[in-house]
């Protein structure tokens, strides 16, 4: 319902827009260029990237312990699995990163083998 209302409002506003005849194409392009220059400066502070280095971690728990039940199971949706998704801080270990770079010959982003 809300989608239809939003779409109707969008179509109505587009139909109601009528550029004045005295507007010159050059003025319209200059206004658009000025808006493109100013737009990045008007971003809200909340849009900045967080620097806490958290990433989603997915854990899957199996209550069956890897055992299958005797006979055939019907697809009831109760398969004995549980999924946990949480945000965890991801640490940086410089020694491990250097080891991976050295052992796998990775040369990206200026990383050099030690």
From Swiss-Prot:
Post-translational modification: Contains three phycoerythrobilin chromophores with binding mediated by both the alpha and beta subunits.
Source domain of life: Eukaryota
Keyword hit for Plastid: yes
Compartments in which it is found: Plastid, Chloroplast thylakoid membrane
Signal peptide: none
Record's bilayer topology term: Peripheral membrane protein
Sites where the protein binds (2R,3E)-phycoerythrobilin 1: 52-53
InterPro entries: Globular_prot_asu/bsu, Phycoerythr-like_a_sf, Phycoerythr_a
Annotated residues for binding of (2R,3E)-phycoerythrobilin 3: 64
UniProt keyword Chloroplast, yes or no: yes
Biological role stated in the UniProt entry: Light-harvesting photosynthetic tetrapyrrole chromophore-protein from the phycobiliprotein complex.
Note from the entry: The light-harvesting system in Cryptophytes contains phycobiliprotein complexes. Unusually they are composed of either phycoerythrin (CPE) or phycocyanin (CPC) but never allophycocyanin (APC), with only one type of biliprotein being present in any one species. Unlike cyanobacteria or red algae these proteins are not arranged into higher-order phycobilisome complexes, and they are found in the thylakoid lumen.
Protein name: Phycoerythrin alpha-1 subunit
Organism: Hemiselmis andersenii
């Amino acid at each position: 319902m809300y989608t239809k209302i939003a779409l109707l409002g969008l179509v109505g506003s587009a139909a109601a827009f009528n550029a004045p005849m005295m507007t010159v194409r050059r003025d319209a392009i200059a206004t658009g260029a000025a808006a493109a220059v100013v737009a990045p400066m008007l971003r809200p502070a909340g849009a900045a990237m967080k620097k806490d280095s958290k990433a989603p971690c997915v854990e899957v728990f199996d209550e069956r312990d890897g055992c299958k039940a005797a006979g055939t199971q019907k697809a009831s949706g109760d398969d004995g699995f549980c999924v946990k998704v949480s945000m965890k801080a991801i640490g940086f270990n410089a020694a491990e990163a250097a080891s991976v770079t050295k052992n796998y010959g990775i040369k990206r982003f200026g990383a050099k083998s030690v």
